[in-house]
Design a protein with these regions (language model features):
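Expand to "…catalyze enediolate/carbanion chemistry for C-C bond making/breaking, isomerization
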Residues: 1-96
């Protein structure tokens, strides 16, 4: 989606996922139609579950949601937060 945005908007729009601009949604729908015409599976990388659900409603056969680095960062942050919640009391100072 980021490369498609840059290509179609000639740099006018910043790259990113889950585009809401009518021209980008129309482009995604044209891609689905072209894939259907040529018996090709259409896939789209999405940033959120909501957008992925919309993409399947538009006819995409496969969607991905998020990416490895985001999932790992979120899991690491949740793990550290959980540890801190269990080990730090109100009167405890940091280790450094």
């Amino acid at each position: 989606p980021a490369d498609l945005t840059l290509s179609l908007s000639q740099g006018r729009l910043a790259p990113g996922f889950d585009r809401e601009e009518p021209e980008m949604i129309a482009a995604l729908q044209r891609i689905v139609a072209a894939c259907r015409t040529n018996n090709i599976r259409a896939a789209l990388h999405c940033g959120t579950p909501d957008y992925a659900a919309r993409a399947t409603a538009w006819g995409f056969d496969m969607v991905t949601i998020g990416g490895d680095s985001r999932f790992l960062a979120a899991a690491a942050a949740a793990t550290v937060a959980g540890f801190r919640k269990l080990t730090v009391s109100a009167d405890t100072k940091g280790g450094y």
